[in-house]
């Protein structure tokens, strides 16, 4: 369940939630990640930074840099169960004439009337949405791996060799990782000098 999003500066991704954990890894640019029913908490991530957003927590992101930005997304588990949108997303869409229909997807009412018999996707009530979890910025910081704070493993089997040093770090995992607990998968970071490579080796995983 690996995806990606590319966005020009000042473009936002609307508040949503998943049924499994969602991980953002910044590949290019600078993004502001925000969460909570009213986007009340936020933090800025740069290239190489990783954040794991828990389930039952509305989240979104905006490219706050000056260049085109690109991030990878990873969802835990084999079945992510879909996506839920915050009520304010539907309200904002309707201001522009957009509605979400069960069989037709996003429908622009400025271009054509809603087809006869079409059903709108049920919108979560404000009361239901208010029961979703939120986290302070300090709490979310424990679920963030920042590139400038990384300390690579000193006993990694790839730390030396004829191809040059290769740094290894377990970003997400069940143990000995920057973001502990696991999200249904592991994420490892490896760095090498340009032109480097690895010889045959094995790992306990």
Set out the residue ranges of the language-model regions.
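Conserved short histidine dyad/triad with adjacent acidic residue
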Residues: 3-18, 173, 186-204
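Ligand-binding pocket scaffold of soluble enzyme catalytic domains
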Residues: 1-3, 11, 24, 32-35, ...
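A short beta-strand-loop-beta hairpin characteristic of the jelly-roll/cupin
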Residues: 17-47, 57, 197-205
